[in-house]
Amino acid sequence: MAPPPPSPQLLLLAALARLLGPSEVMAGPAEEAGAHCPESLWPLPPQVSPRVTYTRVSPGQAEDVTFLYHPCAHPWLKLQLALLAYACMANPSLTPDFSLTQDRPLVLTAWGLALEMAWVEPAWAAHWLMRRRRRKQRKKKAWIYCESLSGPAPSEPTPGRGRLCRRGCVQALALAFALRSWRPPGTEVTSQGPRQPSSSGAKRRRLRAALGPQPTRSALRFPSASPGSLKAKQSMAGIPGRESNAPSVPTVSLLPGAPGGNASSRTEAQVPNGQGSPGGCVCSSQASPAPRAAAPPRAARGPTPRTEEAAWAAMALTFLLVLLTLATLCTRLHRNFRRGESIYWGPTADSQDTVAAVLKRRLLQPSRRVKRSRRRPLLPPTPDSGPEGESSE
């Protein structure tokens, strides 16, 4: 049998006055759960992140939002699920299900998908429900002609858009679940990952996450799946939802045949470490998260052996080019300004001529022929005009 529905005063007392103590948590559905559970009650599971899975529903139940729990689950978890159900919907459907696993004994199903939870995460559940409803409404608008043939479409689980998961109730639940005094006595909460609920710093962070701004949402991405799940995959595809103040459901990957269900193919959702703790709703007027810090500039690369070898090769080629240019220039200059043999210093073997020998050799040389003037002489040459006249005779 489902846990009794809590009153709105109980939510207020749990969130603000802390009057919902461990005695009230343990009392209630314990006797009924023990009667229906074939074995002993399960202990509190490790606090892991929720995950989204596909579920097969009948055509008559395709529009229902159902809260499932295992009869052997801890009574505190059942009361958590009941508080969440009556905070999100006016007339919720709480149903026991023996196919649930011990690590995630709480499941929230809506429009063909299921959100499996180890502990109740109000922010996750509220955001997931509103996201599923928006996508379902967009799908109805796309198939309005087909739906008009079979009559009016079934109504939403709650009348009106603002009556599904009221913001104040969800925020009160998130605050109540984060309180230390609200936990059952004699139970030590175990967690997986870097979170440590037993430390005071982690508890303060969870309270701050319940009242502070939530991280931005990321769109669901689905890889390739089997042909049987193509129809369910198409129902999930669509434009990302509108602005919402609850944390988003992270990336979902299809894993067919995973354990933990009799008629559903399980999919694991990879969640960052800091988004698993329960949080509350935040008004849209609050400031958005700070933008990402700019990436640091790349450091300049140092010299490598290849760059050093290339530099040395370039220097060697430059030196050879300059040397070749100078050699060619010197050769040209030598050819242009080369002189003949000296009239004073003849080529001798020992190169030790004296001044007297040089003068004697110069005097013994035949006389050079006198150059004739190109001008025409005014008078004819006479017989005593000199050697030229004699030579002419």
Curated annotation (Swiss-Prot):
Protein keywords: Cell membrane, Cytoplasm, Membrane, Signal, Transmembrane, Transmembrane helix
**Which segments cross the bilayer?**
310-330
Extracellular compartment ranges equal 28-309
Functional description taken from the UniProt entry:
May act as a tumor suppressor. Inhibits tumor cell growth, when overexpressed.
Can you name this protein? Tumor protein p53-inducible protein 13
| Biased segments, Low complexity type | 289-305
Specify the protein's topology with respect to the membrane. Answer: Single-pass type I membrane protein
Where is there biased composition of kind Polar residues? 188-201, 262-275
Tissue specificity, in the record's words, reads: Expressed in heart, placenta, skeletal muscle, testis, brain and lung.
Q: Which residues lie on this side of the membrane: Cytoplasmic?
A: 331-393
UniProt region (Disordered), positions on chain: 184-306, 366-393
Which BP terms in the Gene Ontology apply to this protein? negative regulation of cell cycle; response to UV; response to xenobiotic stimulus
The organism is: Homo sapiens
Do the record's keywords include Oxidoreductase? no
Q: Does the keyword Transmembrane apply?
A: yes
* PANTHER family assigned to the protein according to its UniProt record, in alphabetical order: TUMOR PROTEIN P53-INDUCIBLE PROTEIN 13
Subcellular locations according to the entry: Cell membrane; Cytoplasm
| Residue spans of biased composition, Basic residues class | 366-377
